[in-house]
């Protein structure tokens, strides 16, 4: 996460802004598990392409690769993203837009993604749309597989007195071709364990399958010594206020990086959720 001079220290002057110089400072590795114990392993980085000296306008790229289990097969998907973020003059609000290209290597599925986001004290909002652009793929003589269109909307907020913990609530929908659309919700708790390590715990539930408990462990190589973490304990104030959103202009875009697919086997459609 970026380092900066607090706006409160220089209220009448243009505040200089600095970013970490090493690209590895914005590299993270994640391992995720669900109840079936099949791991999702990923690497993700966010890098600035162009940024104003005051840090209020940022063009960035987000690159990631995910390896995960789907239909009892190991899938690998690469995500290439381009985004723009703007921070308000008082540094209290960040708004952004992004576009992604997703490619799944095993079957050649392709997808475009479009996203909007807004961040302020105690609250984050993201809206993502997913548009599959590849044709149906023949897995074998009797099985076809198709990437699905969809969207998700997410709200995240800090928990009272715990600035190192964030509660997230997401609604998602995937457009099935032959059966009912997949509609579901996801609730999660994201905790900063240390300046480098995060733990996310959650529950996903939809009309396609049983509820699923999940956990994601993330290690960030750069870390951030100024961000609150669990060892700080509880805060004396319910919510942190006065945050400078320029600290978040190189946060990762939160989206579904896996390509969700549907299989048709001898007339029976099988779907896979988040």
Write out the residue ranges for each language-model feature.
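Residues on the lipid-exposed face of transmembrane beta-strands in outer-membrane beta-barrel proteins
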Residues: 43-47, 80-84, 99, 114-120, ...
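Repeated loop/turn-to-beta-strand initiation elements of outer-membrane beta-barrel proteins
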Residues: 51-60, 87-97, 122-127, 161-169, ...
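Outer-membrane beta-barrel initiation region
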Residues: 5-73, 248-254, 258-274
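Transmembrane beta-strands of outer-membrane beta-barrel pores
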Residues: 31-37, 63-71, 84-86, 101-105, ...
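Short beta-alpha junctions and helix-cap segments that line functional grooves
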Residues: 110-114, 201-203
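Flexible, glycine-rich linker and terminal segments associated
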Residues: 8-19, 133-168, 174-179, 192-200, ...
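Residues that define the transmembrane beta-barrel architecture of outer-membrane proteins
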Residues: 23-25, 37-43, 57, 74-80, ...
